[in-house]
From Swiss-Prot:
Belongs to the pyrokinin family. One of its GO terms (molecular function) is neuropeptide hormone activity. One of its GO terms (biological process) is neuropeptide signaling pathway. Myoactive. InterPro entries: Pyrokinin_CS. This is Pyrokinin-5. GO terms for cellular component: extracellular region. Keywords: Amidation, Neuropeptide, Secreted. It is found in: Secreted. The modification Leucine amide is found at L17.
């Protein structure tokens, strides 16, 4: 659930914003 890979971040900004 994220534009890139923000599944572990909780929102949409993942580890590779």
């Amino acid at each position: 659930s994220g534009e890139t890979s923000g599944e572990g971040n909780g929102m949409w900004f993942g580890p590779r914003l």
